[in-house]
A protein has these predicted regions:
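Positively charged, low-complexity terminal tracts
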Residues: 1-134
Length: 134
């Protein structure tokens, strides 16, 4: 089976990377915020990012063609993805990042299966987010 990869800026993602990110996204919703308004904004950004990734994954899987397929991510999408990856790695490593994540065993198992992808993506998204304007 041919591996499909897509380039996001200077980050190339395969299907397993997209699946890992999608698996981690729900954790970003549990990160505390300073205000209810900020929490609402974060939830909206998370929902938009999740929809983009799921739509992209669905269209890529169904097409199975070599034709170029583009996903357009905004700076907010990159931030959401990086937060989700960071949260997932913290959960898997037991690292305290100031948030008591509520996660069931099934979700933890799914994250564990994707640990390698998440760990590999983390430095790339960190560097990308560090370059984004405030």
């Amino acid at each position: 089976m041919k591996k499909h990869k897509r380039n996001l800026g200077n980050i190339t993602l395969g299907f397993s990377d997209l699946e890992a990110i999608i698996c981690a996204l729900p954790l970003a919703q549990q990160i505390p915020t300073d205000s209810p308004d900020q929490h609402l904004q974060n939830d909206l950004a998370l929902q938009i990012t999740a929809e983009k990734l799921l739509d992209f994954l669905d269209s890529s899987v169904s097409s199975r063609k070599n034709s170029p397929c583009q996903i357009r991510l905004t700076p907010n999408d990159h931030r959401v993805i990086y937060c989700a990856i960071t949260a997932a790695l913290a959960v898997l490593s037991g690292k305290d990042i100031g948030c008591d994540f509520q996660i069931d065993n099934e979700h933890r198992t799914e994250l564990s299966k994707r640990y390698f992808s998440l760990n590999r993506l983390s430095p790339s998204f960190e560097a990308l987010v560090d370059q984004l304007p405030e």
